[in-house]
């Protein structure tokens, strides 16, 4: 029985290392195609880009409250949210809740697809560390609000304000 347990553990470790390696490669390939600084510069050059000081504080607070209430307290990964989501997904026996932070969502929005694959999630984690190393929380929030989908074809907070409320920021 000890041999079986050893083999199972060895297989689990091998699979984990393979998945992590594939995620790391996906992350590196994304950065090779366009480095983070260039990606951010291209986002900031867009016509409908809103700087953080243009966005009302009440709106920023609302987004943080709904999307990632520990945003200013973690390094881009919220272990508590991940565990909570995992437990709720297990209880429901399907994906019902996400544990992604604002930084993780930003990484996904600017580099990766929306598909639910573990390899993409691993790549996202590596990208989160890169983003958190290069940008402060307000810059991350600003980028997030300028790369998120708000529905009805609106991909920035400025577009959403104009489209939904016919108002400028």
Placement of each model-derived feature along the sequence:
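Juxtamembrane regions of bacterial inner-membrane/periplasmic proteins
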Residues: 1-169
């Amino acid at each position: 029985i000890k041999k079986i347990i050893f083999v199972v553990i060895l297989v689990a470790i091998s699979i984990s290392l393979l998945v992590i390696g594939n995620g790391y490669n996906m992350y590196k390939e994304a950065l090779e195609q366009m480095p983070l600084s260039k990606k951010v510069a291209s986002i900031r050059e867009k016509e409908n880009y809103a700087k953080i000081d243009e966005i009302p504080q009440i709106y920023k607070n609302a987004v943080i409250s709904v999307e990632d209430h520990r945003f200013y307290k973690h390094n881009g990964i919220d272990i508590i949210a991940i565990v909570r989501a995992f437990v709720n997904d297990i209880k429901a026996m399907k994906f019902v809740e996400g544990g992604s932070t604002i930084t993780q969502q930003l990484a996904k929005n600017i580099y990766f697809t929306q598909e639910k694959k573990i390899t993409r999630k691993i790549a996202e984690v590596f990208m989160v560390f890169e983003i958190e190393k290069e940008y402060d929380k307000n810059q991350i929030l600003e980028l997030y609000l300028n790369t998120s989908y708000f529905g009805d074809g609106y991909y920035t907070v400025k577009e959403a304000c104009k489209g939904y409320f016919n108002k400028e920021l």
